[in-house]
Amino acid sequence: NHCMNSVMRDASALPYEENVAEIKRCVDYFHAYNIPVEAELGHVGNETVYEEALSEYQYTDPSKAKEFVERTGCDSLAVAIGNVHGVYSSEPKLAFDVLEAVAKEVDVPLVLHGASGIGDEDIKKAISLGIAKINIHTELCQAAMEAINAHKDEPFLAVEREVRKAVKERAM
């Protein structure tokens, strides 16, 4: 028993062929246990200044997406379309044309990492163009920290209850 229901393996910082090999290795292992694998093509940065993240940004190449999915056997694909991990220092500008082109090439669910701070209208548009899963880890951490700070003088279980409530509200 692997105590998990899915795996996300991000090898996107590696050169393309190494990314393919690493994801294929993970898929071969985890599929033996019926565990789906999410991969990333293109590289979603992690910078505190959005413009700096974009300077070395690697958008998902739609022409490689189909081959990548076929060669690796991944079950879902995280795309790099102008999104970054962490807190945005300015308004993110998503490349919806890239998303639309990738969606036409692959038959697996698409994932948007670094969605914390992306506006509701852009999220809705991304969903309409094929995004099936959205990661908002930074927003959830912020909600948890706000709840902890607001209830720091209360007993632990009361704080935990407020954190769960705040995270759930933020996620919805």
Predicted regions and their residues:
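Extended, intrinsically disordered, low-complexity segments
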Residues: N149-M172
